[in-house]
Regions:
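N-terminal secretory signal peptides and thylakoid transit peptides that target proteins
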Residues: 1-22
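C-terminal segment of N-terminal export signals and the immediately downstream linker at the start
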Residues: 25-48, 110, 117, 159
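N-terminal secretory signal peptides
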Residues: 32-78, 83
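N-terminal secretory/targeting leader peptides
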Residues: 54-66, 107, 114-117, 124, ...
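Mid-length scaffold segments of soluble, non-membrane domains
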Residues: 75-100
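Hydrophobic core segments of beta-strands in well-ordered, beta-rich domains
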Residues: 76-77, 126-129
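An anionic, turn-rich surface loop/hairpin at beta-sheet edges
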Residues: 96-118
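C-terminal partner/receptor-binding element of secreted or periplasmic proteins
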Residues: 138-159
């Protein structure tokens, strides 16, 4: 009798603890990454001018002398006009998902994007690790963005 009572009591305790045990891995193992994919020199988007994708329609290297710091990252620009555009509305020009590859993000991975492989969709900039990511994006951008966003929302960021 005592043995059965202990077993039942243990079973009840396990049943009460199980939801906490199931939820714990998402808290304990949450990924922490830099909000922006930074180059070895600390520049966002590998030092490319993020406003130039919109103003010039091209991936353009920024100049060391023209920088803006936003959300802890240093952003380079090719000209003063692009720097001013970014300063006025950085969220309109910053790459989505912090400059990480959109395709990789949709697959729950964090891989830096290549600023030479990019798309603008619905007025937002998306970068990819390789041209294949852009090709997949072209086949279903909204679906890929939704998948990437759902993963992005689970991440925590080093500020």
């Amino acid at each position: 009798m005592i043995k059965n009572a202990l077993s039942r009591r243990s079973f009840v305790r396990l049943g009460l603890a199980l939801p906490a045990l199931v939820a714990a891995p998402s808290v304990v193992f949450a990924k922490t990454i830099s909000r922006f994919s930074l180059s070895k020199t600390g520049h966002a988007l590998d030092g490319y001018d993020t406003a130039a994708y919109f103003s010039a329609g091209a991936a353009t290297n920024g100049a060391d002398a023209l920088t803006v710091t936003w959300k802890g990252a240093v952003w380079r620009f090719a000209n003063e006009e692009d720097a001013a555009l970014f300063q006025a509305n950085p969220e309109a020009y910053a790459p989505q998902f912090g400059g990480y590859c959109t395709r990789a993000m949709s697959l729950k991975k964090e891989i830096p994007g290549d600023p030479e492989v990019w798309r603008i969709h619905d007025g937002k900039l998306y970068v990819f690790f390789a041209s294949r990511g852009g090709t997949f994006f072209d086949k279903g951008p909204d679906e890929m963005i939704a998948l990437a966003q759902s993963h992005w929302d689970t991440l925590t960021f080093v500020e």
